């Protein structure tokens, strides 16, 4: 069985501040104990520099703890007249290691199709970034028992455009749309069922990828339900939304992941 290091990725969405970055690192420096889990902060692009400054300032205090920086989105284009967009190279220059791709809010609010998501996935890897690919079903799709069908379609488009081995440098986040920002989380059993399906799906085309890829759960993860979620055999941590804005609760999730 592969030893997959747990990850807790905080997606601030359009929230946060330079002060939040300071608060988080003040607690990381004294509370994070080891490198048994990886912590990723994904602030709005305007605060990437604030997070980077805190990473540099606390390098010694973190003492080898794995705290990384990620972005919430990127353009599928390398450069050009795309007002308001940020390229993969720009994110790499800013110190990012990860980037969230295909979040349900991007798909729903900004019309990002699976084809666009696949292009962004490729753009991230082209510039040395590890994509955190989000997949998940809506409430009606779950009620219609189409969960596996929807997720398979979202995965297959990325595989068709980028090849299976592209997932050798990628993270997957399962985020059921009916749980994102609603306060209603999937049960540990529901999460495990879908994570196991994703792993099996990838194993069919590459046993190595299926065994080794990290699959995060995203959807109203809190300190009260994280231990049961993270204890599932195919759940390798969480993509955290609202709780990532509370330094105390986010640190609690990091500690839970480290002991999972």
Swiss-Prot record:
Protein name per UniProt: Triosephosphate isomerase
Family the entry assigns: Belongs to the triosephosphate isomerase family.
Function: Involved in the gluconeogenesis. Catalyzes stereospecifically the conversion of dihydroxyacetone phosphate (DHAP) to D-glyceraldehyde-3-phosphate (G3P).
Superkingdom per UniProt: Bacteria
EC number: 5.3.1.1
Catalytic residues identified in the record: 103 (electrophile), 175 (proton acceptor)
Keywords: Cytoplasm, Gluconeogenesis, Glycolysis, Isomerase
Cited HAMAP family: TIM_B
Primary site of residence: cytoplasm
GO molecular function: triose-phosphate isomerase activity
GO cellular component: cytosol
Reaction(s) catalysed (UniProt annotation): D-glyceraldehyde 3-phosphate = dihydroxyacetone phosphate
Pathway: Carbohydrate biosynthesis; gluconeogenesis; Carbohydrate degradation; glycolysis; D-glyceraldehyde 3-phosphate from glycerone phosphate: step 1/1
Compartmental location: Cytoplasm
Record PANTHER family: TRIOSEPHOSPHATE ISOMERASE
Glycosyltransferase in keyword set: no
Record InterPro entries: Aldolase_TIM, TIM_sf, TrioseP_Isoase_bac/euk, Triosephosphate_isomerase, Triosephosphate_isomerase_AS
Description of how the protein assembles with itself and partners: Homodimer.
Gene Ontology BP terms: gluconeogenesis; glyceraldehyde-3-phosphate biosynthetic process; glycerol catabolic process; glycolytic process
Amino acids binding substrate: 11-13, 181, 220, 241-242
CDD domains listed in its UniProt record: TIM
């Amino acid at each position: 069985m592969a030893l997959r290091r747990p990850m807790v990725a905080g997606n601030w969405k359009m929230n946060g501040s330079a002060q939040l970055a300071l608060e988080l690192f003040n607690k990381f420096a004294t509370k994070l104990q080891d490198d048994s889990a990886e912590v990723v902060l994904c602030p709005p692009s305007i605060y990437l520099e604030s997070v980077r400054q805190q990473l540099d300032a606390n390098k010694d205090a973190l003492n080898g703890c794995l705290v990384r920086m990620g972005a919430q989105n990127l353009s599928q284009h390398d450069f050009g007249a795309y007002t308001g967009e940020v390229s993969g190279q720009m994110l790499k220059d800013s110190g990012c290691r990860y980037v969230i791709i295909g979040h349900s809010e991007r798909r729903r609010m900004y019309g990002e199709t699976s084809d666009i998501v696949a292009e962004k996935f490729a753009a991230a890897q082209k510039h040395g970034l590890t994509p955190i690919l989000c997949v998940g079903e809506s409430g009606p799709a779950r009620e219609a028992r189409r969960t596996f069908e929807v997720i398979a379609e979202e995965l297959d488009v990325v595989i068709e455009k980028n090849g299976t081995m592209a997932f050798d440098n990628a993270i997957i986040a399962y985020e059921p749309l009916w749980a994102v920002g609603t306060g209603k989380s999937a049960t540990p059993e529901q999460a495990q069922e879908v994570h196991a399906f994703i792993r099996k799906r990838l194993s069919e085309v590459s046993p190595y990828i299926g065994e080794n890829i990290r699959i995060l759960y995203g959807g109203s993860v809190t300190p009260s339900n994280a231990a049961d979620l993270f204890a599932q055999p195919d759940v390798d941590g969480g993509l955290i939304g609202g709780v990532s804005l509370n330094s105390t609760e986010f640190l609690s999730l990091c500690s839970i992941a480290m002991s999972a």
